[in-house]
């Protein structure tokens, strides 16, 4: 059948674009994963399991607050901005970006206030002493950059996945480099917090710089303007879309960063550290689907929904993601235990049982 002919599948230009963009993201993800393991390895070897767990909890706490509060503004930009660009309507694209940018700013402000305000009530349960409490409060100032996804949406809408790949490789490189320095010079907990903080700050700033540069190249000016309610008037269904994606992402976040924080509260920092290592390996199996999904969304928005092309594109992408995901999962099961022992040491081998 033609639907199962490999050559016929790859004759689809949209499918080839998805694979190309996924390859960009995949290459950076492989680099990011290796550098991320290096950063975690240095932290695990440079501190006791308990303090390693505290570091993981601090990072997960800030991310969980961000995940609960933030809107998936990158989806908004792709959903409404991509058709505007396709139809050569820069003013509508400007409205979409302005609305998305305003949501990021408002939600980021709410998140940072909420994150710092909640911290004193949770500090004892999270295993924070006086020094680590203030470092955790400092880390919470990163929440607005974690909550902002407008620049990611812009880069996807203008098909600059190469720039996304550069950013996704740069941030873990800086984190790994800082972690190596903190481990080598025995800077301890404070050194690792500062290294991770700086890498996140620089990585988040890069996204905004890349996005602003692409907007200037396309003569789209004054898009990064606080204009929440006025710009929303020109985007039909914008509010219902952002609320539905926000709720869906909040539910998703409960399984990820929030679960690490809960493990820390219930079982202690050392258990949270083991859980983080296990989740790092476990999530590798879902990475292919995530990468293809991020590439699929902009392409499907360019297709006519009245035809069968979007559906066929979804089936092809899903089958490809599932096949690669199964192979990655098998690899994790086979090499996971010796890899954990090699990278983190035998004191963290219990993490494999959690996988």
Curated annotation (Swiss-Prot):
One Gene Ontology term, aspect cellular component: plasma membrane
Periplasmic topology ranges: 1-37, 122-134, 199-261, 345-355
InterPro entries found in the cross-reference section: Poly_Biosynth_Transport (IPR050833), Polysacc_synth (IPR002797)
Segments on the Cytoplasmic face: 59-100, 156-177, 283-323
Keywords carried by this UniProt record: Cell inner membrane, Cell membrane, Membrane, Transmembrane, Transmembrane helix
Membrane topology annotation: Multi-pass membrane protein
UniProt key word Cell membrane: yes
Principal subcellular localisation of the protein: membrane
TM segment ranges: 38-58, 101-121, 135-155, 178-198, 262-282, 324-344
Keyword Chloroplast: no
Record's subcellular location: Cell inner membrane
Name this polypeptide is given: Inner membrane protein YghQ
Organism encoding this protein: Escherichia coli (strain K12)
Gene: yghQ
């Amino acid at each position: 059948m033609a639907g199962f002919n490999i050559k016929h599948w790859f004759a689809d230009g949209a499918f080839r674009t998805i694979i190309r963009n996924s390859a960009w993201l995949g290459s950076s993800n492989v680099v990011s994963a290796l550098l991320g393991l290096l950063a975690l390895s240095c932290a695990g070897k440079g501190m006791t399991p308990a303090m390693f767990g505290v570091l993981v909890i601090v990072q997960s706490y800030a991310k969980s607050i961000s995940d609960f509060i933030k809107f998936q503004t990158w989806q908004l930009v792709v959903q409404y901005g991509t058709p505007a660009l396709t139809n050569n309507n820069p003013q509508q694209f400007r409205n979409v970006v302005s609305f998305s940018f305003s949501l990021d700013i408002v939600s980021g402000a709410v998140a940072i206030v909420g994150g710092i305000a909640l911290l004193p009530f949770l500090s004892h349960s999270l295993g924070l002493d006086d020094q680590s409490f203030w470092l955790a409060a400092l880390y919470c100032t990163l929440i607005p950059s974690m909550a902002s996804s407008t620049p990611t949406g812009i880069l996807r809408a203008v098909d600059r996945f190469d720039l996304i790949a550069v950013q996704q490789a740069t941030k873990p490189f800086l984190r790994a480099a800082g972690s190596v320095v903190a481990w080598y010079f025995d800077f301890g907990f404070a050194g690792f917090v500062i290294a991770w903080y700086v890498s996140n700050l620089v990585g988040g700033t890069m996204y905004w710089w890349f996005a602003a540069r692409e907007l200037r190249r396309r003569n789209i000016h004054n898009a990064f303007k606080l204009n929440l309610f006025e710009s929303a008037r020109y985007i039909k269904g914008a509010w219902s879309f952002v609320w539905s994606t926000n709720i869906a992402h909040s539910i998703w976040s409960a399984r990820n960063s929030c679960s690490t924080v809960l493990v820390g509260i219930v079982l202690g920092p050392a258990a949270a550290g083991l859980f983080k290592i296990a989740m790092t390996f476990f999530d590798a199996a879902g990475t292919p689907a995530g990468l293809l999904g991020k590439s699929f969304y902009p392409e499907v928005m360019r297709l006519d929904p009245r035809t069968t092309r979007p559906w066929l594109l979804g089936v092809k992408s899903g089958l490809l993601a599932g096949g690669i995901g199964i192979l990655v999962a098998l690899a994790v099961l086979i090499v996971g235990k010796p890899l954990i022992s090699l990278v983190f040491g035998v004191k963290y081998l219990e993490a494999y049982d959690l996988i």
